[in-house]
Amino acid sequence: NTALIFAGGSGIRMNAKAKPKQFLELNGRAIIIHTLEYFENHPEIDSICIVIIESWIDYLKELLERYSIKKVKWVVAGGITGQESIFNGLQAIYKDCDHPEDCVVLIHDGVRPLINDTLISDNIASVRKFGSAITVSPVIETIVTANENNQIQSVTDRKLCMHARAPQSFILKDIYTAHLKAIDENIHDMIDSASLMKYYRYKLYTVDGPVENIKITTPMDYYLFRAIYEARENSQIFGI
């Protein structure tokens, strides 16, 4: 089982002028290290591939050495789009895999550090049983659609709605084949792996994840991460 960590973002929405958002720190450790440690310490994860902005590869390798992240087997330069970046990582894994029909790959965001061991295990189990695992969390507030005049068109039943999050996990052969088809058909702008697999009519199955499993994209996300992280730390220290 392999984790593919996408860390190709530049941090524009975060206003992170000095560093990409995945390298912003909390308690002295970069966000991507917080994320990687879950996969590094999980007994069912055998290897890790990281897709990163090419100019930051050397800095990432320094962090991996400093924090003893040993399972990283591939560090790959990202592409122009997120889809291309994920393909670059999948291709590196695929070339080294003797049995891609039996390899589970968990695709996760480097800036989504509030995961847990259970979520990783549940993703792997779902792929083994069904062939895919799309992490979701419940929609808490009401979802509406509006027209170009800002007039409400519909109110969607919340019970039917979920947030698609990560990890998004698949059999390596399936997701790699889907990416090859997309390249052949000149499709380069799929928003994520689940959308790509759905487009090619693969069956997708949900795995419930924690509400706090947010992607850190804006300053507000970072402050939420800090608050939740500190709450987790306090609960361990004080038994709250």
Regions found by a protein language model. Name each.
Residues 105:
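Short aromatic/hydrophobic "clamp" motif used to bind/position activated sugar donors
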